[in-house]
C-alpha cells in the first residue's frame, strides 16, 4: 500500500508579483526551492490564505535571492500582490518509508526571507 503525504511546503509566503500574460505556473526564488526540496516542473498546490482559493500549478525557478513568489498565467487571477500563500508539495510513500517520514516545512517572513526550516509537524503549529 502507498500513501500520498505532505512532502514539503513553504508556509505564509507573500505574493511578490502576478503576471497574467505569462504561460502559467509559479515562479519561486531558487533559494526557497532548495530549502523546501522543490524542483522545476513539480506540481504544487497553492492555498491563498487571504481569499481561500486553492489550485494546482507547477514550479518555475526564480533568481536566487530575489524572494520571488510570482503567480503566472491564469493563476495570477487567483491572487493579489501581498497575499499570503502556502505552497504545498506531496509525494507517495510506501508504508515502510513512513517509519522515517519527516516532511520539510519552510517558514518565511513577510518579505519571503527564511525564518525556520523544520521537519516536525507539532499539533498544528506548522501545518
UniProtKB/Swiss-Prot annotation:
Kindly state one GO CC term assigned in the UniProt record: cytosol
Question: What SUPFAM superfamilies does its record include?
Answer: ADC-like (SSF50692)
Enzyme Commission code: 4.1.1.11
One GO term under biological process is: alanine biosynthetic process
Give the disulfide map.
Answer: none
> What's the top EC group for this one?
lyase
Main location as per UniProt: cytoplasm
Which GO molecular-function terms appear in the entry? aspartate 1-decarboxylase activity
What pathway is this protein a component of?
Answer: Cofactor biosynthesis; (R)-pantothenate biosynthesis; beta-alanine from L-aspartate: step 1/1
Q: Cite the cofactor comment.
A: Binds 1 pyruvoyl group covalently per subunit.
Positions carrying Pyruvic acid (Ser): 25
Q: Where in the cell is it found?
A: Cytoplasm
What are the names of the required cofactors?
Answer: pyruvate
Q: Which reaction does it catalyse?
A: L-aspartate + H(+) = beta-alanine + CO2
**Record note on modification:** Is synthesized initially as an inactive proenzyme, which is activated by self-cleavage at a specific serine bond to produce a beta-subunit with a hydroxyl group at its C-terminus and an alpha-subunit with a pyruvoyl group at its N-terminus.
Question: NCBIfam families given for it?
Answer: panD (TIGR00223)
Provide the family line.
Answer: Belongs to the PanD family.
Q: How does it assemble?
A: Heterooctamer of four alpha and four beta subunits.
The role this protein plays is:
Catalyzes the pyruvoyl-dependent decarboxylation of aspartate to produce beta-alanine.
Q: Please give the HAMAP family that the UniProt record associates with this protein.
A: PanD
Q: What is this protein called?
A: Aspartate 1-decarboxylase
UniProt lists the gene as: panD
Amino acid at each position: 500500500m502507498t500513501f500520498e503525504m505532505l512532502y514539503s511546503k513553504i508556509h505564509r509566503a507573500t505574493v511578490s508579483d502576478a503576471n497574467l500574460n505569462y504561460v502559467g505556473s509559479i515562479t519561486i526564488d531558487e533559494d526557497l526551492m532548495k530549502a523546501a526540496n522543490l524542483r522545476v516542473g513539480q506540481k504544487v498546490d497553492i492555498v491563498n490564505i487571504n481569499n481561500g482559493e486553492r489550485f494546482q500549478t507547477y514550479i518555475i525557478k526564480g533568481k536566487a535571492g530575489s524572494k520571488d513568489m510570482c503567480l503566472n498565467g491564469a493563476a495570477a487571477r487567483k491572487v493579489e500582490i501581498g497575499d499570503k500563500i502556502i505552497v504545498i508539495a506531496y509525494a507517495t510513500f510506501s508504508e515502510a518509508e513512513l517509519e522515517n517520514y519527516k516532511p520539510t516545512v519552510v517558514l518565511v517572513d513577510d518579505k519571503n526571507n527564511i525564518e525556520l526550516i523544520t521537519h516536525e509537524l507539532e499539533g498544528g503549529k506548522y501545518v
